[in-house]
Amino acid sequence: MYVQDTIAAISTPTGEGGVGIIRVSGRHVLSIADAIFKRNRDGGLQSHRFYYGAIIDPVSADCLDEVMVVFMKGPHSYTREDVLEIQCHGGYLVVQRILDLVLQQGTRLAGPGEFTKRAFLNGRIDLVQAEAIIDVIRSKTEKSLALAQHQREGLLSQRIARVKDGIVSSLALIEAFIDFPEEDIDVLGIQQVGAHVDCSLTELETLLAGFNEGKVLRDGVSVVIAGKPNVGKSSLLNTLLREKRAIVTSVPGTTRDLIEEVVTIKGLPVKLLDTAGIRESDDRVEREGIKLSLDKIPSADLVLFIIDSSLPFSSEDQAILDVLAPCNFIVVMNKSDICRSFDMPQLPDVPIIAVSTLTGDGIDALQDAIFEAFIHNHAVDSREYVAVSQARHRDALQKSRDALLRFRGNLVAGMELDLLAIDLRDALSAIGEVTGETTADDVLDLIFQRFCIGK
């Protein structure tokens, strides 16, 4: 449990705005409203109704601002406690003065994510849904927002609940065999246990298989644009950004520093890095830029290898291709509007896309190829699509899966029932780490510290 005091914080961004909101949660919100909120009509505040009035300092009788106030009676509120929200004008000083006045009434300034933490501790949401709230706030694309919304709505929690139900059913049968040793353990009972575990394992494997796509949709990917000088790397960056971000000239070696920009490609957050042209150079500054380019390639999620298709495939192209051999890359043959002058080496399983940054031909196909390099599940646009997107969830689900696999092996080996029950309890505990049922307090603190104050 937690100290059930009354907390308050500003819930809107700092600075000028149309509206500022101060949120208060706890058992004393009505007495606070009585002390500082004045309106023309008598009577108490009814739940879930807006009231117009003014915030008055009870000591000086100064009017701080005209406001709208809404009271939400627990448990029908965000935190499941009594909640008061004060909506005032959005200037920094106005909002801060009202918060200070609220704090003077015996409330405490809320910590980061403390309102959401109370919603979790009071059973309104589980930990998966709580973490999804911050993902909703931080989403940069439609697909990452949809994934976060589905998690917030409980779709992932429902899938995890199915895993838990199978483990609980198996554990109940095993413990029944332990508690009633006089009853013979029949083959049908063991088969029933195995069937429950197999269903949970299948669900776990499905969830884990979707982690890479879920993480990509949530966090995005890094894509390096690489190639020799003057093949159109900066032109491609500008084309994908739909703006002139990089200088484009006919002089080889114009780009010497890394240029980094973020763009959305088919709903996927992509960090693009335009790099210096890779070649042998006597220029010290250019050599440093080339070194930076080569250093970025191994850590990239994807490399776009740009080739000038109007020129013969050169030894410089081959040298870059050799560097890219262990990487995930797409060959982009630029200047497709000019007659092609070379034959590409055979590259099995490597997408080769012809584009023209001058005319825009092939850019849609390139964007499709970038998206499909990471997302293979066409259900990502479904209203029911849900995926594991956080490493914490993946790690806990892997622990649960490993415990179930261990149980499976021990069951076949004829191990004692007490040992089998330990495996199932381990699997159940790992599942509880995801939803927050068995999560350590220090882990909870770290999770909610990622939130802003006021949420």
UniProtKB/Swiss-Prot annotation:
Organism, scientific name: Geotalea uraniireducens (strain Rf4) (Geobacter uraniireducens)
A Pfam family this chain is assigned to: TrmE_N
Occurrences of domain TrmE-type G (ranges): 220-375
The organism's place on the tree of life at top rank: Bacteria
Gene: mnmE
Keywords of this entry: Cytoplasm, GTP-binding, Hydrolase, Magnesium, Metal-binding, Nucleotide-binding, Potassium, tRNA processing
Molecular function per GO: GTP binding; GTPase activity; metal ion binding
Binding positions for Mg(2+) per the UniProt entry: 234, 255
Role according to the record: Exhibits a very high intrinsic GTPase hydrolysis rate. Involved in the addition of a carboxymethylaminomethyl (cmnm) group at the wobble position (U34) of certain tRNAs, forming tRNA-cmnm(5)s(2)U34.
Similarity annotation: Belongs to the TRAFAC class TrmE-Era-EngA-EngB-Septin-like GTPase superfamily. TrmE GTPase family.
InterPro entries the record matches: G_TrmE (IPR031168), GTP-bd (IPR006073), GTP-bd_TrmE_N (IPR018948), GTPase_MnmE (IPR004520), MnmE_dom2 (IPR027368), MnmE_helical (IPR025867), P-loop_NTPase (IPR027417), Small_GTP-bd (IPR005225)
Cofactor binding description: Binds 1 potassium ion per subunit.
The protein's name in its UniProt record: tRNA modification GTPase MnmE
Binding-site residues for K(+), renumbered to this chain: 230, 249, 251, 254
